[in-house]
Amino acid sequence: MKYEFIKIDLDTYKLVYTNKDKKEVSIEFKRTIEMAEKLQGIVATARLNMYKELSKQGITKNDLIIKKDDGKGHITYDETNYQEYEKFYIQLEEAIILNEMIEKLFGKNIKDLFDDMGIDNIPEAEQPMQLQLFSSKLGQIISKGLDDTPSEGNKE
């Protein structure tokens, strides 16, 4: 899976990759403030969604935290359950936002884009790492560019 992001101007980039048919594909895209804000709001949105779901079920954050009293005045709190629950919601929100951005930027959903980029040509064990690297690089470009913030979009 060979690809490259190339900066054209302040907010315009292009994704260049060799597709599964060994043809070079170039897709130009523009980053916007709205996209950067969506990326920056992933954790907050995920936590809100998590709290909404917990509330629907009648569960509070404290219900997920295990309190241990050793009987000698020492109390410890195990937040593992809460942290895992929160992590799940953050990963879910990241996947949703990433797919929305890929559809908006490249006109394809994430599965179709990666299939076209030849994800099947790399060992299955390496695929999650490749997806993570691509996602991280795209996220960096959208939020910070290669060296600056987006100027396109609603400046309010």
Q: Which residues does each predicted region cover?
A:
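Short, surface-exposed, charged amphipathic helix/loop patches that serve as local interaction elements
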Residues: 23-156
